[in-house]
């Protein structure tokens, strides 16, 4: 596939759009609106109406702390060279220093020293794990991909990419419940999508418990992956239903 058409009908050469996807503002901003992703499928799984509502939601004034922590842990574990891009405040979020910093820079790039230290401990638990060190030998990190599935453009980034294998880092507050939570949070859909995007045959999760710092490695059976494909098919089916009724949703939602 040399070119890809986005949801807004704009067409790109795949090699050109891949080079842009390292830019977070392009990946989460422009492509967040014009390509589907595993996270956007959550509302599509519910209904076309839920997706239409999601599109019209205003940005959250305050990002949930687990999201902030997860992003910082990923950065520390996978792209530590990018830490210099962050603004670290030696004070609390309630301080004038912090409030001024988030007025001048995106909130997702401003962290307190205590947030950094806490997340560094969690990232270090992963980086210092012998099994993790063996797993990532020869791996590439934070690799973007974009491709069509059922005629629709999907985007994704592999945390860890090996030959034929995609690995994703997840954080949890209770690692003992991860397998049950995986279906609840639609990780099966993510796994199926990423196998498609990266033309791979195996998907693994590296999971770190934010409290105990325990690191676990999870693989799921074919039934889990098949469940993910079924969800992907439902999500794309509901997107086409959304398109059929887009004018109605635009006027009434």
What is each of the regions a protein language model found here?
Residues 1-155, 253:
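Metal-dependent nuclease catalytic cores that hydrolyze phosphodiester bonds in DNA/RNA
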Residues 132-137, 163-166, 196-202:
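Secondary-structure boundary elements
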Residues 152, 185-189:
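Short, glycine/acidic-rich beta->alpha junctions
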Residues 156-178, 194:
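Conserved catalytic cores of phosphodiester-cleaving nucleases, focusing on short active-site segments
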Residues 143-145, 170-171, 207:
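Short, structured patches in soluble enzyme cores that scaffold and shape functional sites
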Residues 72, 189-196:
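Short amphipathic alpha-helical face segments that pack within enzyme cores
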Residues 2, 116, 180-183, 193-253:
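Metal-dependent nuclease catalytic regions and adjoining charged, substrate-binding loops involved
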Residues 59-62, 107-111, 176-185, 221-223:
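Short histidine-centered catalytic/ligand-binding loop motif
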């Amino acid at each position: 596939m040399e070119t890809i058409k986005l949801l807004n009908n704009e067409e790109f050469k795949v090699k050109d759009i891949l080079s842009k996807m390292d830019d977070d503002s392009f990946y989460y901003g422009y492509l967040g609106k014009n390509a589907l992703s595993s996270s956007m499928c959550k509302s599509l799984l519910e209904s076309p109406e839920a997706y239409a509502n999601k599109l019209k939601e205003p940005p959250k004034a305050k990002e949930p702390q687990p999201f902030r922590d997860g992003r910082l842990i990923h950065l520390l574990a996978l792209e530590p060279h990018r830490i210099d891009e962050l603004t670290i405040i030696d004070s609390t979020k309630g301080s004038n220093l912090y409030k001024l910093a988030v007025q001048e820079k995106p909130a997702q790039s401003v962290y307190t020293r205590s947030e950094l230290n806490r997340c560094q401990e969690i990232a270090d638990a992963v980086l210092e794990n012998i099994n993790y060190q063996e797993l990532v030998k020869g791996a590439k990190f934070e690799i973007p991909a974009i491709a069509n599935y059922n005629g629709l453009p999907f985007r994704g980034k592999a945390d860890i990419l090996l030959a034929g294998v995609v690995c994703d880092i997840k954080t949890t507050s209770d690692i003992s419940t991860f397998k049950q939570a995986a279906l609840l949070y639609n990780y099966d859909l993510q796994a199926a999508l990423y196998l498609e995007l990266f033309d791979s045959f195996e998907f693994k999760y590296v999971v770190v418990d934010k409290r105990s710092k325990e690191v676990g490695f999870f693989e799921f059976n074919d039934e889990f992956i098949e469940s993910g494909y079924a969800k992907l098919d439902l999500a794309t089916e509901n997107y086409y239903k959304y398109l059929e009724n887009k004018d109605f949703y635009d006027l009434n939602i």
